[in-house]
Regions:
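A positional/architectural concept
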Residues: 30-33, 42-44
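Core beta-strand residues in small-molecule sensory/regulatory alpha/beta domains
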Residues: 38, 98-99
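Short, basic/aromatic recognition patches
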Residues: 17-25, 79-84
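Short, small/polar residue-rich loop motifs at catalytic or cofactor-binding pockets
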Residues: 29-32, 90-92
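Tandem CBS (Bateman) regulatory domains
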Residues: 1-10, 46-92, 100, 104-141
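A short beta-loop-alpha structural element at the N-terminal edge
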Residues: 14-17, 75
């Protein structure tokens, strides 16, 4: 499964001129901890709820927080496990997806990643998972 197949188009994106207050409201509304910031369809980074709460004034534009942007994105043609890895590595609640030109395609949420990971591991199948540990010599026939 490719990352482009998991894009969630319901999560909004921020622009540089959006206010900290607007960003915090969106984070609260969508129950996530990060939002993507985009300018002219180019992905600039993720801004975290923590960095927004640390801002001096909630009337400030997101633009003044650029030094806090997290550069975590995956390519649209990558395997979905790269998105899982990015989410773990950067500790984000969403993973931005970009195309080859760096244009923002959308985000994958942790919920969508967890569902895909469960399907990938066979968690939705009836039965159990058996792990066998054998010495290498027993592999031969």
């Amino acid at each position: 499964m490719l990352t482009v197949d998991l894009i969630n188009n319901n999560i909004p994106r921020l622009k540089l001129l959006d206010s900290v207050a607007k960003a915090l409201q969106l984070i609260n509304d969508y129950r996530i901890t990060h939002l993507p910031v985009v300018s002219e369809e180019k992905f600039l980074g993720l801004i975290s709820e923590e960095d927004l709460l640390d801002a001096e004034d909630d009337k400030l534009n997101i633009e003044v927080l650029q030094k806090h942007f997290i550069q975590a994105a995956v390519k649209d043609n990558g395997h979905f496990l790269t998105a899982v890895n990015a989410s773990i590595q950067f500790e984000t609640s969403v993973v931005p997806v970009i195309n080859e030109d760096g244009e923002f395609m959308g985000v994958i949420t942790m919920n969508d990643l967890l569902k895909s990971l469960g399907n990938f591991a066979g968690a939705n199948e009836i039965g159990g998972i058996i792990v066998l540990e054998m010495e290498r010599i027993q592999f031969a026939i």
